[in-house]
């Protein structure tokens, strides 16, 4: 059980919450702050003070005063009118993450909701009732209005949820679980939808998957090094310390560990003086992608614990301030950076695939074919990889450089952070498939070299891979092989370890 405080949530905890289905509870001290802040909102309504989103309309309607008797209707209307999401729904892990992150930000005690609202969010998490949230429709400021409105709908018994493997009306799940829908009171609708939790939840899931792929890429690249009789000298610690990037040093160190007892890697001058860049520069390129991942993780953990509501309430109500913490620019930049980092991991992987299949670049059978000419072998797998990396180059165009005005120019600059987050996730899926193709080719190359000559770690990884796909003894439908390996890579990492096979290092 993870305790949410509003301040301490980590990516590692989110792994357990999203991928293991661990439950959540609220810190009592934080809940007390929520209750105290709520008293301020109720006093504002009672006194008839003019405060944005509590006693006024929203966006361009911020100058329209709302009567005390209409405050509840204002919040309900807000949720219904803003539930304009379109397209396919986010994965369940993402909508689960949105519930968790929205509760966590409320636990900072500056949003002004009742404890009841926080508890309802946590009930949905713990009972695995996940909102159906369309992926498209967010500008990323004022936060993820449309996606979070679909999240808020289900608390009211409206909209749809994923529940026990089915997509059902929210009331079906609430009734079965014995829960009553809530009625929103002053500010609560705004507090539910003003924030960056859609882009951040998708970003967290993307980061988790990207981190796993980055570790896996080192194992796969190591297997390729063996298949191509790569030169291990280029991974010498002195080379990488001389440059000074810790991530580069760490990648080189891990690959040295992976290949320490391999009989297939070579020494400088043994077969050739130096390798092509896609082998020789693995630490430099993969290390740079790790720099991206480290940056992204840092920004995500800040945003996961951030107050992104508006207005925010401080000093016991002495300050109720309209600000712009809902603006998704920090996450938009981070997601665009993640896109570039993962696209490059795929790019260099595709170049290694080419070196594995091109008979002009190695001494292996052409296209790793069992009968070159009669059978095409891995020829078209390289085409597929080339297609994926080219698609990634289009998706890697930064969403964050775009902006378009909304709400009659009141909201005249937006982040497009959710678009960046969604595209990052697609790039990661594509990159995983490219790595799957490299792994299939590297395993085949290793067989030509002799499995007995592989390192202990790569041999273990090879045998695990061969449980997913057989050797290429005849041409077959390789699409199935690629998807099988890609699915295995997606699920073949432990929550507590970097990667099952890597835990032995």
Swiss-Prot record:
| Alphabetized GO MF terms | histidine ammonia-lyase activity
Q: Highest taxon of the source?
A: Bacteria
Q: Which UniProt keywords apply?
A: Cytoplasm, Histidine metabolism, Lyase
The record's subcellular locations are: Cytoplasm
PROSITE patterns listed in its UniProt record: PAL_HISTIDASE
Q: Which InterPro entries match?
A: Aromatic_Lyase (IPR001106), Fumarase/histidase_N (IPR024083), HutH (IPR005921), L-Aspartase-like (IPR008948), Phe/His_NH3-lyase_AS (IPR022313)
Entry EC number(s): 4.3.1.3
Q: Which reaction does it catalyse?
A: L-histidine = trans-urocanate + NH4(+)
Biological or metabolic pathway of the protein: Amino-acid degradation; L-histidine degradation into L-glutamate; N-formimidoyl-L-glutamate from L-histidine: step 1/3
Q: Post-translation: what modifications?
A: Contains an active site 4-methylidene-imidazol-5-one (MIO), which is formed autocatalytically by cyclization and dehydration of residues Ala-Ser-Gly.
The UniProt entry lists the main location of this chain as: cytoplasm
Q: Which SUPFAM superfamilies match?
A: L-aspartase-like
Task: Choose any GO biological process term that the UniProt entry carries and state it.
Answer: L-histidine catabolic process to glutamate and formamide
Which sequence ranges form a coiled-coil region, renumbered to this chain? none
Mark the residues carrying the PTM 2,3-didehydroalanine (Ser).
142
Instruction: Name any one Pfam family assigned in the record.
Output: Lyase_aromatic
Q: Which NCBIfam families match?
A: hutH, PRK09367.1
The family line of this record is: Belongs to the PAL/histidase family.
Report what the protein is called.
Histidine ammonia-lyase
Q: Which gene encodes it?
A: hutH
């Amino acid at each position: 059980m993870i305790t949410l405080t509003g301040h301490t949530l980590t990516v590692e905890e989110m792994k357990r919450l999203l991928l293991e289905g661990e439950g959540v509870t609220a810190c009592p001290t934080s809940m007390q702050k929520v209750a105290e802040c709520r008293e301020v909102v109720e006093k504002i309504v009672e006194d008839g003070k003019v405060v944005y989103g509590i006693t006024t309309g929203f966006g361009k309607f911020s100058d329209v005063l709302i009567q005390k008797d209409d405050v509840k209707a204002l919040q309900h209307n807000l949720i219904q009118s803003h539930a304009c999401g379109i397209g396919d729904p986010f994965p369940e892990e993402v909508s689960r993450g949105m519930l968790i992150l929205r509760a966590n930000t409320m636990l900072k005690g500056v949003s002004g909701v009742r404890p009841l609202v926080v508890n309802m969010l946590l009930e949905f998490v713990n009972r695995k009732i996940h909102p159906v949230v369309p992926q498209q429709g967010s500008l990323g400021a004022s936060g993820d209005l449309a996606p979070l409105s679909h999240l808020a709908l289900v608390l009211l018994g409206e909209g749809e949820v994923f529940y026990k493997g089915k997509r059902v009306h929210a009331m079906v799940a609430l009734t079965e679980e014995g829960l009553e829908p809530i009625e929103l009171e002053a500010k609560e609708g705004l507090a539910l939808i003003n924030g960056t939790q859609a882009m951040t939840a998708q970003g967290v899931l993307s980061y988790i998957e990207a981190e796993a792929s980055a570790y896996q890429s080192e194992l796969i690249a190591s297997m390729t090094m063996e298949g191509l009789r790569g030169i291990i000298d280029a991974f010498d610690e002195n080379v990488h310390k001389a440059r000074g990037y810790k991530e580069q040093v760490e990648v080189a160190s891990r690959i040295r560990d992976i290949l320490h007892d391999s009989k297939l890697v070579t020494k400088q001058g043994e077969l050739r003086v130096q390798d092509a860049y896609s082998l020789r520069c693995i630490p430099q390129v993969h290390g740079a992608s790790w720099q991206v991942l480290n940056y992204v993780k840092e920004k995500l953990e800040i945003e996961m614990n951030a107050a992104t509501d508006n207005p925010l309430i401080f000093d016991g109500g002495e300050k109720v301030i309209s600000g712009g913490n809902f603006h998704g620019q920090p996450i938009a930049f981070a997601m665009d950076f993640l896109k570039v980092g993962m696209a490059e991991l795929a790019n260099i992987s595709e170049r290694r695939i080419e070196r594995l299949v091109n008979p002009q670049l190695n001494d292996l059978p052409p296209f790793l074919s069992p009968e070159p000419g009669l059978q095409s072998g891995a020829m078209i797998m390289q085409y597929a990889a080339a297609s994926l990396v080219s698609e990634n180059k289009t998706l890697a165009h930064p969403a964050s450089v775009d902006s378009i005005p909304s709400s009659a120019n009141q909201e005249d600059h937006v982040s497009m952070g959710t678009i960046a987050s969604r595209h990052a996730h697609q790039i990661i899926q594509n990159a995983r498939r490219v790595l799957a193709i490299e792994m299939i080719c590297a395993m085949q190359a290793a067989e030509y070299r002799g499995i007995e000559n592989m390192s202990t770690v790569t041999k273990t990884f090879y045998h695990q891979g061969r449980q997913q796909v057989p050797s290429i003894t005849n041409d077959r439908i390789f699409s199935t092989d690629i998807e099988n390996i890609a699915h295995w890579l997606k699920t073949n990492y432990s929550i507590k370890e970097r990667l099952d096979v890597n835990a032995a290092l």
